[in-house]
Amino acid sequence: MSLATVHTRAKLGIEAPLVCVEVHLSNGLPAFHIVGLPETAVKESKDRVRSAIINAHFEFPARRITINLAPAELPKEGTRFDLAIAIGILAASGQVPMDLLEQHEFIGELALSGELRPVEALLPSAMACANDDRALIISVGNASEAALVGQLTVLPATHLLQVSAHMHGREPLKPWQPSPNKLSTSAPQLNEVIGQEHAKRALEIAASGGHHLLLFGPPGTGKTMLASRLPGLLPALDNAEALEVAAIHSVASKTDRAAHSLQRPFRAPHHSASATATAIVGGGS
């Protein structure tokens, strides 16, 4: 059969909508077209995928290849579609069986040698994949991040050949076993503050009652120091909230913070940030 459909995920803020990579091989002069609103990095995947397939000792089909990234109205950006496109071409050309395609999602960048490279902002995709009850095949470099999502089968690979062997059933990929999570205990504590009894009492009342709190005074009196200790008074995040915070860090490429922590985040914008709205919400040119 010369038509194959592979599942992957796009990046849209902290959302990860499903993308179906539809690959069709037809007769005619050899050509390679990608449609479905692809950005520049996605268009460039044609060269990466071709080289990866050839260097992995597969046969690149000398036919007219049309790839549709559906839904077509959703913008596609980044290199995360490389693996799904390659698997779709191999499946449509009969070099990889289609039996297990529906049970998996594929996300990863391909090197010219066929090696798998990690991508940014994977955690929202892993969360969405878990909701759809599919296994996720990714680069080993993304395995720890994806494993933060419970009830998700994470299948890390280092090369396109490993993914092919898994699809054939010869050498199934082993599910990633995350190491025990060590939660951060370095949060500033209110008992470290000497003095400021009235301010500390105000923090306790605001934390227990869920009230807003305004701290004002001359520079150097400890306003930021006190505010940074408010998360230590608040209840821990539940699992869904912790994953949402980690997803935001993942999208912001703060990989050092994209970990499963139950501590509530603390943000401290500069005092001059109120001059413009973009300083608070981001954006601009």
What name fits each language-model region?
Residues 151-158, 230-237, 267-275:
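Short, exposed beta-strand "edge-strand" segments with a Pro/Gly-rich flavor and a Y/T-containing core
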Residues 1-228:
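Peripheral, non-AAA+ core regions of ATP-driven protein-machinery
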Residues 168-205, 209, 240-285:
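P-loop NTPase nucleotide-binding/switch module
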Residues 215-259:
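Walker A/P-loop
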